[in-house]
């Protein structure tokens, strides 16, 4: 009987690292809001956690780009790699970016409850649609189609964190490190 680790190829290891980068992004996000009433410190410590989460998501996108060609060339077990890839993508490109947006723009203790509720619904929408997209891609991968519909989950994550970073860097936006 073979162990799971013996079934893994190099692409599976890269996929696991991508998933761990998604978990690291979630940990950075949790650290960024350790104190929900005052998430921005003057010395930028909490802001550095936000940038750390964004960096982990970006590195996961890069890993996801390279694990596909490696898997197609050197794959030992296609089923194991495909399942790992979907789980890793869900954490790194659905949950982490949605939670990051919720934390960055939640305005804890300042905003009206309707803002937080709307932002929470938007974050849940990103997660659910991302999961459905990944499930659909996994299902359609078994057929002979050579294309897919919609926005790929890594591209969705990049759109979200790019928009968030651009808003975050604008001092007049009321968000980000220069909030007084």
Task: Annotate each PLM feature.
Residues 1-19, 70-90, 132-155:
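Interhelical loop and helix-boundary elements at the membrane-water interface
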Residues 24, 70-73, 91, 95, ...:
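Generic hydrophobic alpha-helical membrane-span motif
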Residues 92, 130, 139, 163-168:
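Non-catalytic alpha-helical coupling and interface elements of nucleotide-dependent molecular machines
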């Amino acid at each position: 009987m073979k162990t799971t680790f013996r079934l893994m190829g190099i692409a599976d290891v890269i996929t696991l690292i991508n998933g761990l980068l998604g978990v690291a992004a979630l940990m950075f996000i949790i650290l960024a809001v350790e104190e929900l009433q005052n998430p921005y410190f003057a010395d930028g410590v909490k802001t550095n956690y936000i940038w750390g989460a964004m960096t982990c998501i970006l590195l996961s996108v890069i890993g996801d780009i390279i694990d596909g060609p490696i898997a197609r060339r050197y794959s030992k077990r296609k089923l194991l790699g495909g399942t790992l890839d979907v789980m890793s993508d869900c954490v790194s490109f659905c949950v982490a970016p949605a939670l990051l947006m919720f934390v960055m723009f939640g305005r804890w203790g300042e905003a009206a409850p309707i803002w937080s509720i709307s932002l929470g619904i938007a974050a849940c929408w990103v997660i659910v649609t991302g999961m459905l997209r990944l499930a659909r891609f996994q299902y359609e991968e078994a057929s002979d189609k050579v294309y897919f519909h919609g926005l790929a989950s890594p591209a969705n994550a990049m759109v979200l964190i790019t928009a968030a970073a651009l808003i975050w860097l604008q001092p007049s936006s009321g968000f980000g490190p220069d909030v007084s």
